[in-house]
């Protein structure tokens, strides 16, 4: 491991009087700025990722709703297809709110889309 004095390509910031935090992780978010992950819109998801990053979120788990399998597969493909760069929070997983739920505790989830197994 090199010492700080040996590193030639570095930028030093004066953080005196400031609080320095690691990037935050958002593990449950359906969307932001008028976009929803379940819309399966690549541009919308990229906008969400940029918004999250601009607010200190560096790692992100977009959350899906209980939907038919075909729709879920399309939504998950969106997460695979979205272009992520340094302006975006990084997708580190997907939070599936359904379809694997107890129908007795389904809340707002549509029962016909809850998987039996």
Tell me the role of every PLM-derived stretch.
Residues 1-21:
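Histidine-rich, glycine-flanked metal-binding segment
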Residues 6, 40-44, 110-116:
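A glycine- and small-aliphatic-rich helix-loop capping segment at beta-alpha/alpha-beta transitions
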Residues 11-13, 25, 94:
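Hydrophobic/aromatic beta-strand patches that form the interior of the parallel beta-sheet core
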Residues 18-42:
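Di-metal (Zn2+ and/or Mg2+/Mn2+) metal-binding site signature of metallo-dependent hydrolases
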Residues 30, 46-75, 89-102:
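Divalent metal-dependent hydrolysis catalytic cores, especially in the metallo-beta-lactamase
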Residues 77-117:
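Metal-coordinating catalytic core of metallo-dependent amide/deamination hydrolases
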């Amino acid at each position: 491991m090199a010492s700080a004095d040996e590193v030639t390509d570095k930028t030093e910031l004066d953080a005196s009087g400031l609080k320095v935090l690691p990037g935050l992780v958002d593990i449950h978010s359906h969307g932001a700025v008028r976009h929803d992950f379940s819309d399966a819109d690549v541009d919308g998801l990229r906008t969400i990722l940029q918004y999250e990053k601009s607010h200190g979120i560096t790692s992100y788990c977009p959350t899906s709703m209980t939907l038919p399998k075909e729709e879920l597969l399309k939504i998950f493909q969106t997460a695979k297809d979205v272009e992520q760069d340094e302006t975006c929070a990084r997708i580190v997983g997907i939070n599936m709110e359904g379809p694997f739920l107890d129908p007795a505790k389904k809340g707002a989830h549509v029962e016909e889309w809850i998987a039996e197994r």
